[in-house]
C-alpha cells in the first residue's frame, strides 16, 4: 500500500517515473477533477496536464481504478470525458475502442446522445453507436439478441462486424436503438 501526494505527479519527478514502472491492484485518485486538460490560452490548452497524462499512463497498469471527486466538471464538459478516458484506458468497456470508433470518446459528438437530444437516423447508424462498446446482455433491449447472433461473451465489449454482415434478426433488433432516449438510457 502506498499513499502518494499528487504533488509528485504534477511535477515530472523521478518518483513519478518509478510509479509508472509498477503494476497495481487498486489505484484511488482523490480530487480526480484535477486531472484535466491544461486549459487557458495558447496552443497547449487542449493537452493533458501532468496528472491527467500520468493517470492515462498508469490506468492500464491497475486491475481496479477509483476516481473520487465531488465536482467532475469544474469549468468544461470535456473534463468529465477526461475522467472517462482514464477509466477506459486498458479496459475499453467505458468509452469503447476509441481508435476504431471515436463516437463515445468524442464528448462533442457523444453529449447530445447522452442527454437524449440525438437519436440514430437508421439501424445502420444505431449499430455504429452500439457495437463499441457493446453493453452486456444483462442490459436487456437488443443486447442479448445481438450478443447471441455475434457469439460474443459478456466480457468482450466490441464487435468489428459491419451492419451488412448482421443477420435479419440482429438488424431488426437494432430498431429499438432508434427510439427517443435509447442512447441516453444505454450509454
Tell what function each PLM region has.
Residues 74, 81-84, 185:
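Short, hydrophobic, well-ordered secondary-structure elements
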Residues 2-24, 41-63, 67-70, 91-187:
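Inter-lobe coupling linker of SF2 helicases/translocases
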Residues 35-38, 42-44, 74-76:
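Catalytic P-loop NTPase motifs of RecA-like helicase/translocase cores
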Residues 30-31:
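Walker B catalytic acidic pair
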Residues 63, 78-79:
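Conserved catalytic segment of ABC-fold P-loop ATPases
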Residues 80-94:
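A short helix-turn-beta junction within AAA+ P-loop NTPase domains corresponding to the substrate/partner-engaging
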Residues 9, 34-35:
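A short, flexible beta-alpha/helix-coil linker loop
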Amino acid at each position: 500500500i502506498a499513499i502518494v501526494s499528487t504533488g509528485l505527479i504534477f511535477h515530472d519527478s523521478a518518483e513519478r517515473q518509478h510509479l509508472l514502472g509498477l503494476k497495481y491492484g487498486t489505484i484511488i485518485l482523490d480530487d480526480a477533477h484535477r486531472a484535466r486538460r491544461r486549459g487557458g490560452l495558447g496552443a497547449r490548452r487542449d493537452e493533458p496536464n501532468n496528472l491527467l497524462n500520468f493517470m492515462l499512463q498508469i490506468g492500464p497498469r491497475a486491475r481496479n481504478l477509483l476516481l473520487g471527486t465531488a465536482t467532475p466538471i469544474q469549468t468544461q464538459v470535456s473534463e468529465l470525458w477526461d475522467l472517462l478516458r482514464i477509466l477506459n484506458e486498458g479496459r475499453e468497456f467505458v468509452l469503447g475502442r476509441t481508435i476504431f470508433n471515436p463516437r463515445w470518446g468524442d464528448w462533442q459528438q457523444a453529449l447530445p446522445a447522452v442527454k437524449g437530444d440525438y437519436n440514430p437516423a437508421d439501424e445502420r447508424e444505431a449499430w455504429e453507436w452500439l457495437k463499441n462498446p457493446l453493453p452486456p446482455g444483462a442490459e436487456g433491449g437488443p443486447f442479448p439478441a445481438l450478443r447471441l447472433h455475434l457469439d460474443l461473451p459478456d466480457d468482450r465489449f466490441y464487435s468489428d462486424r459491419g451492419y451488412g454482415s448482421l443477420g435479419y434478426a440482429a438488424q431488426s433488433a437494432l430498431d429499438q436503438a432508434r427510439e427517443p432516449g435509447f442512447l441516453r438510457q444505454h450509454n
